[in-house]
Amino acid sequence: MSDSSREENVYMAKLADEAERYEEMVEFMEKVAKTVEVEELTVEERNLLSVAYKNVIGARRASWRIISSIEQKEESRGNEDHVAIIKEYRGKIEAELSKICDGILNLLESNLIPSAASPESKVFYLKMKGDYHRYLAEFKTGAERKEAAESTLLAYKSAQDIALADLAPTHPIRLGLALNFSVFYYEILNSPDRACNLAKQAFDEAISELDTLGEESYKDSTLIMQLLRDNLTLWTSDITDIAGDEIKETSKQQPGE
């Protein structure tokens, strides 16, 4: 792909973002991502790729949660005919989720992670790899769930090793990793203690170096720190009474997601 067509695809991705046409945004950024053997993605390009996939997967994750909630209610009422219909519909959403996750995971494995030169980009892509394996673990069952959870843990740990060695405690990508890694411990591994320890350590280390934070990343970093604190408050409160509360993870606006 020539420089001009790479630039054109980036511009088209921005247009698709403005128009909220995220499937097309993914297509444009996939084309850009496949040019990394020439030059790795810029910060802007990798954030566009992340935003595109986050929106495409986010819509399906929300749909899956709603349908699963309705399924539970119908099961409790004994409406077996409705449950059968819902299960089939849930399966359709899960197939879409799997396809999206497989798409970005293949791109990360084949193109983006091998081309990453800086510690920042390595952590960004390994975190992304962990995120999309985690999204698979949210709805898979049995051996597939176990495999997705193990892959998530490996990716997050690899990212964490680099982040702790090479990124400042206040770096938004390091903080975003800690946020999502702690959510993984809480939601997927059912380990509230580990989730709280990880989130608290990340928050405390960032607080102690807050005065060194540059103006350009201050807003991003403090926003993620607030999300870490929100989750800690949620998890350390009466954890038997958190149904309906929303656990925070890095959103499309965060530079780590």
Swiss-Prot record:
One of its GO terms (cellular component) is cytoplasm. SUPFAM superfamilies: 14-3-3 protein (SSF48445). One of its GO terms (biological process) is signal transduction. Belongs to the 14-3-3 family. This is 14-3-3-like protein A. It comes from Glycine max. The lineage of its organism: Eukaryota, Viridiplantae, Streptophyta, Embryophyta, Tracheophyta. The gene is GF14A.
